[in-house]
UniProtKB/Swiss-Prot annotation:
Free-text activity regulation comment from the record: Regulated by guanine nucleotide exchange factors (GEFs) which promote the exchange of bound GDP for free GTP. Regulated by GTPase activating proteins (GAPs) including TBC1D20 which increases the GTP hydrolysis activity. Inhibited by GDP dissociation inhibitors (GDIs).
Annotated source species: Homo sapiens (Human)
Transmembrane domains' residue ranges: none
Cofactor: Mg(2+)
PANTHER family hit by this protein: RAS-RELATED PROTEIN RAB
InterPro entries with a match to the protein in the record: P-loop_NTPase, Rab, Small_GTP-bd, Small_GTPase
Protein name, as recorded: Ras-related protein Rab-1B
Length: 201
């Protein structure tokens, strides 16, 4: 069997509603941007294949709803994620303050050694910026996780954010892991459905 990729990484985008998670995903996966804001309902995902260090890596990127009412649905997607990108809005202090809460969610639901990346989005809105780059960088450094400011609107650092995440995961997994597009990675999303029981509303 000759698979079309060497690695399959599942990434998760989390953060408050309205910080631009869907826009980041659209920019990275389709290189498009839209001003019209529609809240993600539950979970959406896109796939993009990248080349890194001579290897083909398939990124399965899950975009989660930020609203509290979807928290129980989205929490099941933490399981099996190789990397989680926590997004806040640089023009919204509350979304930055809530990063700690999102990191607690990761500790609660994700695997222990999952890779994390902190992203401050909407960096193009310089006049409205309230979260200082240095503050966020120091916070990320204290946790030992990478940090980037991005703009889905003008594409600043969007590519770099996802590539950084992929490189970190690849480094952690080492040369032998997840190669050959092994099937065990693909059954992750079929298991969390059962415990929920009688529907989600």
């Amino acid at each position: 069997m000759n698979p079309e990729y060497d690695y399959l990484f599942k990434l998760l985008l989390i953060g408050d509603s309205g910080v631009g998670k869907s826009c980041l995903l659209l920019r990275f996966a389709d290189d498009t941007y839209t001003e019209s804001y529609i809240s993600t309902i539950g979970v959406d995902f896109k796939i993009r294949t990248i080349e890194l260090d001579g290897k083909t890596i398939k990124l399965q990127i899950w975009d989660t709803a930020g609203q509290e009412r979807f928290r129980t649905i989205t929490s099941s997607y933490y399981r099996g994620a190789h990397g989680i990108i926590v997004v806040y809005d640089v023009t919204d202090q509350e979304s930055y303050a809530n990063v700690k809460q999102w990191l607690q969610e990761i500790d609660r639901y994700a695997s222990e050694n999952v890779n994390k990346l902190l992203v401050g989005n909407k960096s193009d809105l310089t006049t409205k910026k309230v979260v200082d780059n240095t503050t966020a960088k120091e916070f990320a450094d204290s946790l030992g996780i990478p940090f980037l400011e991005t703009s889905a609107k003008n594409a600043t650092n969007v590519e770099q954010a996802f590539m950084t995440m992929a490189a970190e995961i690849k480094k952690r997994m080492g040369p032998g892991a997840a190669s050959g597009g092994e099937r065990p990675n693909l059954k992750i999303d079929s298991t969390p459905v059962k415990p929920a029981g009688g529907g989600c509303c």
